[in-house]
């Protein structure tokens, strides 16, 4: 059909793929239904009977179709594919996924916006989630990142407040520029991420023209038990491509599902998107001498000092068979690690180790890892966790549900023990506020001076001013003060743009 894309033809494709006649409609318990288009009533105009179990079955299930929306990253797209190792990194990491060149590991990916609801526009100015689930022989490994290498805050205790400011005002239920800019200007460590957000990369052209980053610092352990710090990068093989402000705004109204559609159509037409994975590594000794806190997620590691090391390629070659089953129910958690990969002292990472799994248990139930898309199907689950709502397995039959035991229960894994690193830690227990004690602007200055050209600087300032001009005057002044600390030209240009915006409103 001319003028229709692959996504528009999904139902036609489904019909054409069926090789047998359609079966009978059934109830949820499998009983065939003879009449589907009428309720059971007393006479043609009479009331519906309580014994109409077909209606009760249909309506009671419909009433429960929606599950809680993700509190962040609600709007997203998913796809499946594989990761293939192209370069040997076993000197750094003993995880089985990397144990030989040309090895392929199946994976699932979910891309998303962050602040919007599930019906919001794909082209909104927002960071993009970039989460990868690797189904390895050592269990599921989730690398849960974004399309930016940094984040707004470095202490997880501020995360709920930060997200509240990105959502809606509790009284007006409107997006509130005062909330948005009040928090960000009071937390100057956000300046790095804010500048990336309001740069051209804040509105990527779909999900396939953006990079992905693990963002956090992790520890890799090799077969000798030697640890090293690392960061993960995914560079798009399609090339970076962004939407200008006018196009992004136009698509928000004409095709709010633009990015979901683009990903689906690429895969359906066999134009499989791919990304190349790289790592940066830093020894413990280098970390001690690093000019910044190497575990600060508001900063990057210089690629000149810590060059990118190629690892492999991620290819997406299958669309979800059902969105709810394989995308809405997919659950990523930074706590899903495998032997050879461990957390670093990154505080934001530590907060996410708890919160992601916790929110999945709320949203999907305590046995969410039994949902097929989340199940570590390459290994047999053997532990001492039992029961719980919606346990749909054999519940590990009659195996002992305690440890240690004398009755042939599962034992500790020597390999996993050998790949557990020992990390000496000393210090005084206290609540250390880092808002003003760290360098919050040095790397942002580098971004302004060395990354952005003249035109990109102008667009960044215009994008910030367009949003900031809707905030209260004192918040505009505070923002200008912060950005002036990045660079005097930045503050001057922003002041000029805000004055232009102010005059245009009168």
Swiss-Prot record:
Self-association state and partner proteins as the record states: Homotetramer.
Annotated positions binding heme: 356
Keywords from the named record: Heme, Hydrogen peroxide, Iron, Metal-binding, Oxidoreductase, Peroxidase, Peroxisome
Protein name: Catalase
Catalytic residues of the enzyme: 73, 146
Function according to Swiss-Prot or TrEMBL: Catalyzes the degradation of hydrogen peroxide (H(2)O(2)) generated by peroxisomal oxidases to water and oxygen, thereby protecting cells from the toxic effects of hydrogen peroxide.
Encoding gene, per UniProt annotation: Cat
Gene Ontology cellular component annotations, sorted alphabetically: cytoplasm; cytosol; major mitochondrial derivative; peroxisomal matrix; peroxisome
Cofactor field: heme
A single BP term in Gene Ontology: regulation of synaptic plasticity
Family under the similarity heading: Belongs to the catalase family.
Compartment list: Peroxisome matrix
Matches recorded under Pfam families: Catalase, Catalase-rel
Keyword Plastid: no
